[in-house]
Amino acid sequence: MNPQHHFIGLSDQQVADSRAKYGINVLTPPPTTPLWKQFLEKFRDPLIIILLIAGVLSVAISIYEYIGLQQGAEVFFEPVGIFVAIFLATGLSFYFETQADKEFCVLNQVNDDEPVEVIRSGNHTQIAKRDVVVGDIVRIGIGCEIPADGELLVATQLSVDESTLTGEPLCHKTTDTALFDSKATYPSNRVLRGTKVMEGHALMQVTAVGDATENGKVYKAAQIDNSVKTPLSEQLDWLGLWVSRLSCSIGVAVIVARIVMYLAQYDFCFAEVDTLAFIAYILQTLMIAMTLVVVSVPEGLPMAVTLSLAYSMRRMLKTNNLVRKMHACETMGATTVICTDKTGTLTQNRMSVEEACFYRGGEDCKSIIDANKILLDSSDFSNEIKEGIAVNSTASLDFSNPAAPSVLGNPTEGALLLWLHANGVDYEALREEVKVVEELPFTTDRKYMATVVESALMPGKRMLYVKGAPEIVYDLCASTDGIPSKAAVDAQLKLYQQRAMRTLGFACQEIGDEKVIVDGTIHADKLRFLGITAIADPVRNEVPESIGECLNAGICVKIVTGDTAETAKEIGRQVGLWTDKDTDRNIISGPEFAALTDAQLDALVMDIKIIARARPMDKKRLVEALQRKNQVVAVTGDGTNDAPALKAAHVGLSMGDGTSVAKEASDITIIDNSFKSICKAVMWGRSLYQNIQRFLLFQLTVNVTACMLVLCGALMGTEAPLTVTQMLWINLIMDTFAAMALASLPPSEAVMNDRPRDRRAFIINRPMLAEIVGVGGFFFALLVALLYIFEHADIQQLTDIVRVQIGESSTVTPYELTLLFTIFVMTHFFYLFNARAFATHRSALHLKGCKGLIFISTLIFVTQVCMVELPGVQRFFNVVSLKPLDWLIIIVGSSFVLWIRELWSLLWNKK
């Protein structure tokens, strides 16, 4: 690098002064709607409006009873109870949705923590984007999102996507004033926060941070995208609409039935009907019908889904999965194929030079020991290797910890710099002493990079250095004097690749003043092949087990890598994907893959396990071919060129150290890059779906029981079996409380033993439907039988039922109605545990990690007891105290719901 391009950057004191003067690099979020307004918005919900109308009707009835019938002030307890229930349900819903919104704000926080490479006090280091200050010197490269506004100091073939600010998709940036675009919105040497580097690399000096940037003036907070309608969300919308219509029909049926039964008492002789009493009865009927509709409509379903997503997103973040688009949570659970990169995902991405083979005029260096010796001498050959590695690179080392320097930038290039450093070669000094004339950045299509410099180690020489895939670099070389044949080099490469090593080839040529980099290629007629390095990148310890989990879960795993077939095959063997039974049909190279017709690809795609020497568009085509086979595809990517594949997949998985372009195109960011985290995301996705099924199972079972009981009560002509406030309490249990309890259930590793579900299969499957109808029908039959007994016999306590004598129809007493209400609640209380264990074949009492369920169930039980036994509360719910023996009978009897399920589970597990 030219000496005038050696930058020191800011000192620690200058950083502190700049931050104090210009502020931090964080954008102030736009003002949000005040909480009180958000709360009032809840009262615009149609169901809340219906409840408010019911409350007003209840007030009207109470006024009639108080004034017209001269009853006591206790008649107002029911309307008060209705309004308390409305505010309680609305308040809880508002609170938990607010908490969920806080979870969704995590995206902005993570964006501000993105790593940025800067030069400070002469050292290259990484800091969080929020810590960038005015005056900082920042390195930007392909795929980076520019962290602040700044002015370019050095730029190499830099193109920036400014479409987010100016609408220009590609702007060429340069420091050469002669090449400035006079028509550009901003000067060609100025780069802006939030825009993205699409090609090249550069150094910039920050001129504005935070709200002072151009982006800050038009800032809108990053949002987690919930706009995509998945098959599940469409199903839930349809289910909610269907249940709502059915509930309204039942509500109308209740109104008609109650009016008919009332008029039947007078043989439909309207002259004998007390008008005021009839109006009061009509109002009471309307109130019951509207409340029944409110209870039946699954308004808790959206909250259950929201809570499940929020809980899943928070816990997934702890397992290194940052959800960027909410639909991905659910879709990951239906994934049937995962297309994964190799480097960093299956391997540790901790690269080191393990072997080297250099060729010096017939004198071969075939070991790392020999290569180390070459670095220590001062021959031209040694200088070509040292200088070529140092200057033909975009990586740097961070010496913040001198004992263990870390790599900034490309890990493969970083391994070479670490090798130089370990042998006492100061790569920074070499960069500072040379003058860079031309550069050709690396691309996945080209598979090599080149740099032209005026040499410092060989004064007076202008050198072209090339580095890249060995077979590509070797083919570029014209001079083969003293160099082994292509076959010999290929044989050496194969030995390295069979040990899962990544190989790089090096070449150089002394040139004159002519331009050798033209239109993205090098034009050199005497390029000389220097040799090869073999870089080891060990497999992550946890990956073989995670691959096994995915295969056991019925998920196909495919490796898509730029490495050679031998390297990829060996990695596949180490992680348990490639076996002795696999053949050439299971592995294909990028060029061979590109040559396939769509028909040929469709016939082969499910058999392919590895694509070697793959290019980014190969990955996209693979995704599309799998989708044609009705597969649900998740794909990983970390580079800008991976964006098309990430967008095409059902779930795009970007890597934590990937480019900003890749992250923006993805649905989930794997923060630690590990395949194990991908496996965890699948487990969370499946568990999320299962939790929603559990909530639906519980809610619809309660719906069936409540609707049929109230309708049957109306047809029987009895007093309403459940009062409005009682139904609202039941609604609170099955909607809000059940959503809280079942949405927060921890994921079960057992879901990884199941095959992937059909993504378009209806969420209510046959076992669920059978249980909803069966259990709901049983509860309904039990309660109707009790209601019939209560209507035709005087029950003082439950033990009277065994010796009851059915007589004439009579009024159901408050004690009997309290028994009915409490039995309803307690049977469903115990059924909540059954719903938690649905489809697991595990005990319903296995509550490890279910803190939310334990808390909610305890709250329901204690509240029900207080509601029935506390005199100050009884009046709101039209209940009376129960005898201790009746409590014991109800609890023990209702618990049979649980024990029958436990017996069934025990018998099933013995099969």
Residue ranges and their predicted role:
Residues 1-756, 761-764, 821, 838-911:
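Conserved cytosolic headpiece of P-type ATPases
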Residues 470, 474, 773, 777-778:
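Glycine-rich phosphate-binding loop plus the immediately following alpha-helix
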Residues 630, 682, 686, 781-793, ...:
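Alpha-helix capping/termination and helix-coil
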Residues 702-706, 774-783:
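Core segments of transmembrane alpha-helices
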Residues 714-723, 789-815:
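Helix-coil boundary and interhelical linker segments in multi-pass alpha-helical membrane proteins
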Residues 734, 815-832:
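Generic alpha-helical transmembrane segments
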Residues 759-777, 807-819:
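Membrane-water interface at loop-to-transmembrane-helix junctions
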Residues 778-793, 864-875:
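Alpha-helical transmembrane segments and their membrane-interface junctions
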